[in-house]
């Protein structure tokens, strides 16, 4: 299975491990080690510990540089959305890491291969093994392929307000003028409705409604992001 994993990593990501034992350790659960007591095997927990720290650092550094206007609180929320069990388990599935985990028979029968917590652990342990084997640059190349493009796909929009996401999306290739114009104000005193239009370099992109001008602007930005991503 580890040989197959090596072939898969080489073919898919151009990754060639110098020390296959690190890769084997990263994809081995304790239950497998317990069922093979005479093979002197190691399981992933120590490497996972390292991988978690590496991911925290690299993701923190990336979003710090990418979002120079984002305050500390919003950076923290964005990092928390990117560096979490839900995200890592999805990345692991996308990378097909679930197919290469070495599990004990009991854990296999219990469906551990699809367990989010295990997939998260395996993703972290792989990063730890890659860092030990090949260093910072290899890890950065991998996460630039697997993690960071998800920012442009809207995976983490819930952690950053839509206006910030729209600004970052549009200004990657240079400055553009983004304006929010109030189109109408209606409803009742207890249930007001505001409608706002967002324009980019003078061109109308989308509108949004909300119970306040701020909420309407957020909705307009959200709709603009959805439209621009579909058109991309």
UniProtKB/Swiss-Prot annotation:
Transmembrane segments: none annotated. Its main location: cytoplasm. This is Ribonuclease 3. Belongs to the ribonuclease III family. The keyword Cytoplasm applies. Mg(2+) binds at residues 48, 121, 124. It comes from the Bacteria. It catalyses: Endonucleolytic cleavage to 5'-phosphomonoester. The active site is at 52, 124. SUPFAM superfamilies: dsRNA-binding domain-like, RNase III domain-like. Residues 161-230 form the DRBM domain. One of its GO terms (biological process) is regulation of gene expression. It is an enzyme of class 3 (hydrolase). Digests double-stranded RNA. Involved in the processing of primary rRNA transcript to yield the immediate precursors to the large and small rRNAs (23S and 16S). Processes some mRNAs, and tRNAs when they are encoded in the rRNA operon. Processes pre-crRNA and tracrRNA of type II CRISPR loci if present in the organism. GO terms for molecular function: double-stranded RNA binding; metal ion binding; ribonuclease III activity; rRNA binding. Residues 6-135 form the RNase III domain. It is found in: Cytoplasm. Its EC number is 3.1.26.3.
């Amino acid at each position: 299975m580890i040989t197959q994993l090596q072939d898969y990593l080489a073919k898919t990501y151009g990754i060639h491990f110098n020390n296959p034992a690190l890769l084997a350790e990263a994809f081995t659960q304790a239950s497998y080690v317990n069922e093979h007591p005479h093979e002197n095997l190691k399981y992933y927990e120590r490497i996972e510990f390292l991988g978690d720290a590496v991911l925290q650092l690299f993701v923190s550094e990336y979003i710090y540089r990418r979002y120079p206007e984002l305050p500390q609180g919003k950076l923290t929320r964005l990092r928390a959305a990117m560096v979490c069990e839900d995200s890592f388990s999805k990345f692991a599935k996308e990378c097909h890491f679930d197919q290469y985990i070495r599990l004990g028979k009991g854990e296999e029968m219990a469906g551990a291969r699809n367990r989010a917590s295990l997939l998260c652990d395996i993703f972290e342990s792989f990063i730890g093994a890659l860092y030990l084997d090949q260093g910072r640059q290899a890890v950065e190349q991998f996460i630039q392929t697997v993690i960071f493009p998800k920012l442009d796909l809207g995976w983490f929009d819930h952690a950053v307000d839509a206006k910030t996401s729209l600004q970052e999306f549009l200004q990657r290739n240079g400055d553009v003028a983004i304006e929010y114009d109030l189109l109408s104000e209606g409803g009742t005193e207890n249930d007001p409705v505001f409608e706002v239009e967002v324009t980019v370099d003078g061109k109308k992109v989308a509108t949004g409604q909300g119970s306040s001008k701020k909420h309407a602007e957020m909705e307009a930005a959200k709709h603009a992001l959805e439209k621009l991503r579909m058109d991309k």
